[in-house]
Amino acid sequence: LPEPSTLPDAAPPAEIRIDAPLQRFAAALAVLGWAALIAQAFISVNRHIALGNGAAYGVMMYTGYFTILTNAFCAMVATAIALGPQASANWRWWRAPDKITAAAVSILLVGVVYHFLLRAIHHPTGLEYACNIALHYLVPPLFVLLWWRAVPRGALLWRDAAVAFAFPAAYAVYVFARGAMAGVYPYPFFDVLKIGYGAALLNAAGLSVAFVLVGFAFVALKRGAASGR
């Protein structure tokens, strides 16, 4: 997938330029992402029904994972790109350069954190194994490739790194608030009941630093490419 031509750095575009290869690639990625998300939702909800927790509890647990929310974010972006120039204004909002970048930063770190921190304690089988591969190992690199191909040179400002951080920051607030009310935490490094607030907040701070650094790196890649800085 070749990268689009250089655009002026001084006036970042609100809309990306979509050609047929990009549209087809985005469509394939959207199908992969939505299929994995739907299959994983079916597995997760039915597991909790079988345990006697009910479907609503299953949905709550399913939507508590950053992996799920980030893959849904990426699937929305990919769908918006796949719809092409005729997409509505609402869909075009999802494919603005800052939104694509925010999704790319988060999905990259989803893959990295899972591989290094969670893989050893997670052992899915059957269909769930296939979903796990898609959500943690296929979508992350493919979406970063989509980001590289879709976001033009000079399309980002430094403040877009803050946009990229807003999503995981909001998730952290959600996780701790939900945990305080429901007593459940999706990840061991956030589990206040087991490691305490001090360790959980320290882990959140460490991940925040990672998100900020990666966000600035993504912006720098596109800004630097435009001007040679």
PLM-predicted stretches and their roles:
Residues P13-L29:
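N-terminal membrane topogenic signal
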Residues G54-M61, R95-A96, H122-L135, W158-A161, ...:
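Non-cytosolic membrane-interface motifs at loop->transmembrane helix junctions
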Residues M61-G64, A182-A217:
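Membrane-interface transmembrane-helix boundary segments in multi-pass integral membrane proteins
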Residues P140-L156:
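Alpha-helical transmembrane segments in multipass membrane proteins, preferentially the mid-helix core
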